[in-house]
Structures are given as C-alpha cells and as structure tokens.
C-alpha cells in the first residue's frame, strides 16, 4: 500500500512540480519599482521621430524644430 502511494506521489510531482506554483515574491504588487520604471515611453519613441519633418509655430518652439 505504501509503495503505491509513493508511486502516486512521484507521478504527481513529475506531472505538476512544486515550482509551477506561484510564490508570493512573484506577484507584481510586490515589485512597484518594476511597474513604474517604464512610465516614460515617449523617450524611446522620440528617438525614432525626425523633428525636421515638423514645424513649430508658437512660443514652445525649440532649436531642433523647423519654422513654419
């Protein structure tokens, strides 16, 4: 009887290992710094945009803008 139980437990552990269970440290609420790290998505996107294709008409014009 005990050997059957051991075989059953071994099969269950092989099919569903304990590492598949989520741990408390894996919850996103425990890592607020990782969530707020990527809050500024405009900086990588602005590197792809060529400012010479746009014109600035107003007080917020910078040196990299083209006048209208």
From Swiss-Prot:
InterPro entries referenced in this protein's UniProt entry, alphabetically: Conotoxin
The intrachain disulfides are 55-68, 56-61, 57-65
Q: Does this UniProt record's set of keywords contain Signal?
A: yes
Q: Which UniProt keywords apply?
A: Disulfide bond, Neurotoxin, Secreted, Signal, Toxin
Function description: In vivo, elicits a series of symptoms, such as being sedative, tail stiffening and twisted jumping, when injected intracranially into mice.
Homology family? Belongs to the conotoxin M superfamily.
Tell me more from the record: Negative results: does not target potassium and sodium channels of locust DUM neurons.
Q: What domain notes does the record hold? A: The cysteine framework is II (CCC-C-C-C).
| Name under which the protein is recorded | Conotoxin Vx2
């Amino acid at each position: 009887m005990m050997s059957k139980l051991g075989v059953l437990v071994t099969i269950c552990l092989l099919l569903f290992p304990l590492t598949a269970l989520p741990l408390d440290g894996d919850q996103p609420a425990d890592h607020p710094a990782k969530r707020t790290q990527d809050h500024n998505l405009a900086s990588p996107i602005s590197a792809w945009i060529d400012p010479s294709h746009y014109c600035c008409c107003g007080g917020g014009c910078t040196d990299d803008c083209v006048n209208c």
